[in-house]
Regions:
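Core mature regions of organelle-targeted
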Residues: 76-86
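Flavin (primarily FAD) cofactor-binding/catalytic cores of flavoenzymes
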Residues: 1-73, 78, 121-232, 236-244, ...
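Flavin (FAD/FMN) cofactor-binding and adjacent substrate-gating region
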Residues: 86-118, 265-279
């Protein structure tokens, strides 16, 4: 670890370190302009959470500086950490390499030790989520990353050699152009929240919510609350309701017992994180089809937040037979018996379906999904998995007809929808270093190759004066 004692000292060291790492110190990107005369961004990143910040940092380190991040949230509220993430700490063990991408002075551990005193990091088991948000705010500020907040991407269209992006800010819409779009729109960003139809059809909208909604838990004080789903998010929401004074909280799960196997841990190795995307289609499908049958159990500390309360109930074998209103109560019939509640929280995950992403409407029908590419053998059918986008090696969408829709490959889906194609390298922190490197290498390759003729012409027309022997540009060995 470093011996810096103040954040000012650390930030000065980071500036020196970035200058040292800036090699070769030569700009290589060519400026592009739309026929209208409007400027064109090389890369626009939708989402300025931890993934978007890491990607922008990595691109700028590669001297791709004409970058813009757009986020619909206010400054300091990007991502889920202080909105709908209801855990107390990150679920990932603190050994991860985060958006620092291996640069120790930028790492959360270095920042945390300076903020809280030397040795504070060693006492942590996992990073508190509020501290993580503070770190991301500092990370963005110290790197001076270009973020526009409270901006919503409304529409993505192909226009000539570029992507035409319609954005909304402060009630007004405008158009910007980009050569590349990276979507880091979060876990709900490729299809939306999944609410079981039996719930949405049977209840008024003020009697249920999705676990990723902004829920007024204080209003649930003294009420009977049900939570559908026994994953970590379900337990986080149950614990929050209990801590806010709910009369009782009932987790309703289909399974007969709580699952204990964390199958995803088997994929947390260099082999899987680096090369899952290089496996054959049949191998990737078999793994992901098997994976989809498991619900990750809550971490031990999350489970303890609920079980310490006498008014917490875990109801196994409780799939939903009927859901409706009986008087002023939410009445639920399950195989294990009926239950009357005041409010229902659906920790039921997210839909992955590009046709349900509003901003992709003009292009969605031309985006290849797994069912277009792969026909699974008997016994491995999985309609939900078949709707996942079939991505290229660098997270790019693939067009069903590339000649008719060439710009589709300039949209990179860096989120939960990529897991079937490239593995768990952008759905959390454990794979961040692998995912960002793969994405950025692909983007820089595409941008360079697209300007190939111009780069060739530059070399053929080199006519520079001799370089002095002691010049920093003299690379002669």
């Amino acid at each position: 670890m470093t011996d810096y004692t103040t954040l000012e000292d650390l930030e000065a060291a980071i500036a020196r370190e970035l200058a040292y790492m800036d090699f070769p110190p030569k700009d290589w990107m060519l400026e592009h302009q739309h026929p209208s005369g409007d400027p064109v961004y090389d890369v626009v990143i939708e989402g300025a959470g931890m993934q978007g910040l890491a990607i922008a940092h990595a691109l700028i380190r590669q001297r791709v500086r004409n970058v813009m991040l757009l986020d619909e949230n206010a400054v300091g509220r990007e991502g889920p950490w202080i909105t709908y993430a209801r855990m107390q700490s990150l679920r990932t063990p603190k050994i991860f390499v985060g958006p620092d991408l291996g640069q120790l002075n930028l790492a959360v551990r270095t920042w945390y030790d300076i903020k809280h005193g030397k040795g504070a990091w060693d006492k942590l088991v996992k990073v508190p989520k509020d501290e993580w948000m503070d770190y991301l705010n500092w990370f963005r500020e110290v790197l001076q990353l270009p973020v526009e907040n409270e901006v919503t991407l409304k529409l993505v269209e192909a226009e000539g050699d570029f992507l035409r992006l319609t954005i909304e800010q402060g009630g007004a819409t405008r158009t910007i152009y980009a050569r590349k779009l990276v979507r880091t729109a979060g876990i709900a960003g490729c299809g939306g929240k999944h609410i079981p139809a039996i719930v949405s059809d049977g209840l008024p909208s003020d009697r249920y919510a999705h676990s990723a909604d902004m829920i007024d838990f204080a209003a649930l004080k003294g009420q009977d609350v049900g939570v559908i789903g026994c994953g970590a998010s379900g337990f986080d929401n149950a614990a929050t309701a209990l801590e806010q004074g709910a009369k009782s909280v009932h987790i309703l799960m289909r399974r007969k017992r709580l699952q204990t196997v964390v199958i995803s841990r088997a994929m947390h190795s260099v082999g899987y994180l680096q090369h899952f995307g290089d496996l054959e289609d049949a191998q990737r499908w078999e793994i992901m089809n098997h994976f989809s049958g498991f619900t990750p159990p809550p971490p031990e500390e999350t489970l303890a937040r609920t079980t310490r309360h006498d008014n917490f109930h875990l109801r196994a074998d409780s799939s939903l037979n009927t859901v409706g209103m009986t008087g002023d109560k939410v009445h639920v019939e399950t195989p294990s018996g009926p239950i009357d509640l005041d409010f229902l929280i659906c920790a039921t995950g997210f839909t992955i379906d590009v046709t349900k992403v509003p901003e992709l409407t003009p292009l969605a029908e031309d985006i290849m999904v797994w069912r277009d590419r792969y026909d699974p053998p008997a016994g491995q059918e999985n309609p939900d998995l078949g709707l996942h986008p079939y991505l290229g090696r660098n997270f790019e969408f693939i067009a069903k007809n590339p000649e008719q829709s060439p710009r589709i490959a300039d949209i990179h889906e860096y989120g939960i929808a990529s897991i079937s194609s490239l593995g768990p390298i952008c759905t959390g922190l454990h794979g961040m270093a692998f995912g960002v490197e793969r994405l950025v290498r692909g983007i820089t390759r595409d941008l360079f190759v697209a300007d190939g003729d111009a780069h060739v012409a530059q070399i053929l027309n080199v006519n520079e004066p001799p370089i002095a022997p002691d010049s920093e540009e003299d690379w002669t060995i």
